[in-house]
Structure formats: C-alpha cells, structure tokens
Amino acid sequence: MDLIIPASYDPKLSVRQTQEAIRYIRETFQDEFGKELNLSRLSAPMFVPSATGLNDNLNGVETPVSFSMQDMPETSIEIVHSLAKWKRVALKRFDFEMHSGLYTNMNAIRKDEDLDNIHSIYVDQWDWEKVIDQSERNLTTLKETVQTIFKVIKHMEHEVWYKYPEAVYHLPDQIHFVTTQELEDRFPKLTPKEREDAICKELGCVFLMQIGGTLKSGERHDGRAPDYDDWQLNGDILFWYEPLQKALEISSMGIRVSEESMLKQLKIANAEDRIHLPYHQMLLNHQLPYTIGGGIGQSRLCMLLLGKAHVGEVQASVWPQSMIDQCEENQIHIL
C-alpha cells in the first residue's frame, strides 16, 4: 500500500460539491464523447459465465471474483474485469453499421489490485467499441481516434472551469505520440513506470503506443491480454499529474486483434488453449467485425479534472483503515 500525501493539500470543493461535480462531469463527458465518436449507449453485464471466454484476463495473473447462482449451480460466473471482448460480440449481435459503435458504463471488481492514490478494487469506466474496416487497422486510425478523445477531455476542462473555476486542474494543449521502444531506448536504466513519469513530466500528455509485446531488452513494458488489443496498434493516454508528481493513466485503448494477430499473440503468451473458447472461435471464423475500442476511467477523469489527491475522493470503495485515517489527517476526504 503506497500512499502519496501532497504537501499542503487543499481539496477546494466540499464533499457535497465534489459529488455534484462528479455527476456533472460524468453526464457531460459521456454525451460529448458519444457524439464525437458516433457511439450509442448500451446496457452491459456486470458478470459473465466463465466458459464463454468473454472476461478480460488483464495481465494473466489476476483472478476474477466468481460465484454460482441458485438456478445454475453448475455454471461458474465471473464479475467482469472489463468488457473488452463482450463489446465486440455486442457490435455483431446488435448489427452496428460501419463507423458506428457503443459505449457503456462498466463497473468491475479487480480484487488483486495494489491499492494506492490511483488504484482501487472498484473500477468504473466508459467502455467503448466501434466498427472499422479491415483497411483501417493502422496507426493513422489509432492516432486520429486518440486525438478525438483528447479533444473531448480538453473540452471537459473548459466545462469544469466554467462551473468550478477554483477547482479545475489545467491540462496541456496537445498530446504526443511515443512508442514503448522509443521510451526504453531513451531511458534504458529506468523501470517502465519511471519512464512513463519521465516522459509525461517532459511533455505533459502522451499516448504511449505498442504495449504488450517484448522490447529489445527482452522485457515487456507492461502486460496486455493477447486476445483483444493488437499489441502493435494499442496504447495508453497518460497525463502528467502535478499533485502526485507522477503519470496518470486515463485510458487504455487500441485496435483489436485480427484473426492472424490473435493467433500470433496467443502463441507468444502461451495461451493457445483459449482458441477453443466461443469468443475466439467466433473471431477465427470471421464472425466478428474489425473494431477499435477501449476504456476511459470515470473516477480517474474526475480526479484529474478536479485536482484530487486520491481516487477515493471521487468513488466509493473499500480501503484499509490506516489509509483512510492518514488521508483524513491531510484533508483528503475518502467517500
């Protein structure tokens, strides 16, 4: 449990004002985001049957919260880590047209998360997915989509400034594109997270591309499941966050795997046993559209725009009492 206490922290808004600001940010952002990317809101599951292969395996070591239900005692059911694969199936199931897509309010539990200022076991994000043509599976499509998302986030900065000028955290005016290999080449002696901090402190906002594959050093920058993002066409939107003196990830996204790239990545990840799961069979049999998608952290975005020191100020979760006590002593009011 690593907790950062900013010096002389002033939350600016009361707890009740913060709650109202959270509502405003969430409602305004999802409307603007949906319009800009041509996305429709869909209801989404909080849990899925384990056997479908629809849950997000994250880095491959986290275990989902699972249970059985009275009317289906033989079926193992998992609370989702994310909806990365479910969304792609939903686009097919509900006949979304080319260049249209969906977003949903995703709530997840990641019980193996290491708790700190920005990590919680409760995850709330706008999960989104959009149909693209096979010919659009390239860096140009990825970068254009990132620029659109950045534009919406910048627009939200203005909206928050208009309503809460005393509280808004000011963002950089542009986003820069850097690959994980470029980062390793430049900062070979730093850890991956230290590299992210260094480049974000220098540039303000970065889209860090190509996460999941092995770098020249033989190490990975970070883990990614092998069966949704194409590791050559994905990345994270990171902001330098002055209150915590570190990079803050707001979104993880990417162009999704093709049949070929999924097989390649499953082999690299030694996860070829997944090929026989229903989701993977649908993809291999050309039954799913080519897509781009990702997740945007709702609490993280609120935290960023309001200059909060702890994600627990903008979401209700469970925290160690020692963390709660230390936060309260320093004007950090955990919900």
Swiss-Prot record:
- From which domain of life does this come? Bacteria
Its pathway is: Amino-acid biosynthesis; L-asparagine biosynthesis; L-asparagine from L-aspartate (ammonia route): step 1/1
Whether Ligase counts among this entry's keywords is yes
Q: Which Pfam families match?
A: AsnA (PF03590)
What's its catalytic activity?
L-aspartate + NH4(+) + ATP = L-asparagine + AMP + diphosphate + H(+)
GO (cellular component) term, any one:
cytosol
- SUPFAM superfamilies with a match to the protein in the record: Class II aaRS and biotin synthetases
Task: Please state where this protein is localized.
Answer: Cytoplasm
Q: Which UniProt keywords apply?
A: Amino-acid biosynthesis, Asparagine biosynthesis, ATP-binding, Cytoplasm, Ligase, Nucleotide-binding
Tell me a Gene Ontology molecular-function term this record carries: transferase activity
Question: Gene3D superfamilies from the entry?
Answer: Bira Bifunctional Protein, Domain 2
Q: Which PANTHER family match?
A: ASPARTATE--AMMONIA LIGASE
Supply the HAMAP family for this chain. Answer: AsnA (MF_00555)
UniProt record similarity statement: Belongs to the class-II aminoacyl-tRNA synthetase family. AsnA subfamily.
Name of the protein this chain belongs to: Aspartate--ammonia ligase
Which organism does this sequence originate in? Pediococcus pentosaceus (strain ATCC 25745 / CCUG 21536 / LMG 10740 / 183-1w)
Species lineage, top-down? Bacteria, Bacillati, Bacillota, Bacilli, Lactobacillales
